[in-house]
């Protein structure tokens, strides 16, 4: 597998809608950086958040997930409580080619503050807004800034197309919009 460069990412985004909206340069003045980089794309976090809360004494169960585990917040700055967790989604909508696997890595700026972002791979043929998982590993409240960089996506090109894509397999997270909670089907 090869890591794909900026010119490939730009061409796929501008001509095939792989990333929408697409920022064809790195934007970093006064913000946590986002946009096209040398070998990746730094996506932005949207302004809608689901913040874990224990107000309803819910139990976190991935097979039977309860909506009352969260409070919903629409804001430009999300405060994550100490040792807590927030779900959000990317501003960008992704359409992944059949011969590409995308991995996500966190932003150094957030990691240095104890904020970890986790995203599972974007499979060949998948499309949607990416649900982002932010963990505040510190004993202090932490901020996430909407419409600024959240994580970097790295595009890996396979030697050939896969036999069955995420779309072919009717993956449960296909075409997701906004924040998508855990699904077990």
UniProtKB/Swiss-Prot annotation:
UniProt entry tagged with the keyword Nucleotide-binding: yes
Any Pfam family the entry gives: DCD
EC number: 3.5.4.13
Keywords: Hydrolase, Nucleotide metabolism, Nucleotide-binding
Highest taxon listed in the record's lineage: Bacteria
Quaternary structure and interacting proteins, as annotated: Homotrimer.
Family assignment from sequence similarity: Belongs to the dCTP deaminase family.
Functional note: Catalyzes the deamination of dCTP to dUTP.
Protein's recorded name: dCTP deaminase
Protein source organism: Wolbachia sp. subsp. Drosophila simulans (strain wRi)
Species lineage: Bacteria, Pseudomonadati, Pseudomonadota, Alphaproteobacteria, Rickettsiales
């Amino acid at each position: 597998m090869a890591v794909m460069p900026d010119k490939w990412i730009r061409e796929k985004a501008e001509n095939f809608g792989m990333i929408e909206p697409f920022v064809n340069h790195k934007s970093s003045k006064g913000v946590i950086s986002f946009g096209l980089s040398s070998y990746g794309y730094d996506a932005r976090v949207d302004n809608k958040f689901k913040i874990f809360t224990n107000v309803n004494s819910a139990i976190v169960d991935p097979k039977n997930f309860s909506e009352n585990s969260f409070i919903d917040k629409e804001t430009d700055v999300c405060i994550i409580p100490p040792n807590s967790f927030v779900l959000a989604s990317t501003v960008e909508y992704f359409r992944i080619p059949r011969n590409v696997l995308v991995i996500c890595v966190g932003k150094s700026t957030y990691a240095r503050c104890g904020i970890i972002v986790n995203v599972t791979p974007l499979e060949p043929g998948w499309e949607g807004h990416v649900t982002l998982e932010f963990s505040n590993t510190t004993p202090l409240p932490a901020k996430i800034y909407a419409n600024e960089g959240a994580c970097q996506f790295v595009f890996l090109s396979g030697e050939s197309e896969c036999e069955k894509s995420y779309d072919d397999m009717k993956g449960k997270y296909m075409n997701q919009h906004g924040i998508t909670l855990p699904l077990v089907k």
